[in-house]
């Protein structure tokens, strides 16, 4: 069948637009992973997804439904001398742990639980992994609340971590509630309000 000029240009444009996805497919298939992940990777990581995966194969974990073993397989395929102690791997495990907790309804996790998850995945220096995740801007570290008495120091065991987007949202909500509480006027005497 004959293809008109306009249709040929559309087909060619579509082919060029899909080029980043084809590059990702090449990486994934080379690592023995399903090619069907490529569209999601390209959507999540953008037009330079293949380069980003070559630089940090554990970025694959930013997609839902991808397991650590898949990202490790990709790392072995694209990195010479891939190492389980790589800080990029540790940073990705921190993010994966927090995303998993978020799906279960926990937007903030105690740092001790994140350390335990890192150790369970064989990360020998979990503190470095957490620092890398915080420095990347994807994770927020929340300081423990100040103790009621002036003499006590905050308990470092109460440090928590969250994904940045949820941590910032919760902080904004908390600030708004504090502002409302500070400016609100009482509309009824507490004694006149019946308990529920």
Where are the language model's segments positioned?
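Accessory alpha-helical DNA-binding modules that contact the DNA backbone or grooves
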Residues: 1-159
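ASCE P-loop NTPase motor cores of helicases and related translocases
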Residues: 120, 124-127, 148-196
């Amino acid at each position: 069948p004959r293809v008109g000029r306009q249709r040929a240009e559309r087909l060619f444009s579509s082919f060029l637009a899909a080029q980043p996805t084809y590059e990702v497919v090449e990486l994934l298939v080379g690592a023995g992973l399903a090619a069907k992940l490529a569209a999601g990777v390209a959507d999540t990581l953008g037009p330079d997804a293949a380069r980003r995966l070559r630089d940090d194969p554990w970025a694959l974990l930013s997609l839902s439904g991808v397991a650590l073993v898949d990202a490790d397989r990709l790392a072995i395929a694209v990195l010479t001398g891939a190492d389980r102690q790589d800080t990029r791997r540790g940073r990705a495990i921190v993010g994966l742990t927090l995303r998993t907790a978020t799906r279960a309804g926990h937007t903030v996790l105690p740092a001790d639980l994140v350390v335990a998850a890192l150790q369970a995945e064989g990360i020998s220096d979990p503190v470095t992994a957490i620092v890398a995740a915080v420095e990347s801007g994807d994770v927020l570290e929340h300081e423990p609340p100040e103790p009621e008495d002036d003499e006590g120091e905050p308990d470092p065991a109460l440090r928590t971590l969250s994904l940045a987007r949820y941590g910032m949202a919760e902080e904004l909500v908390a600030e708004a509630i504090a502002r409302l509480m500070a400016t609100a006027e009482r509309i009824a005497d507490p004694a006149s309000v019946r308990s529920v």
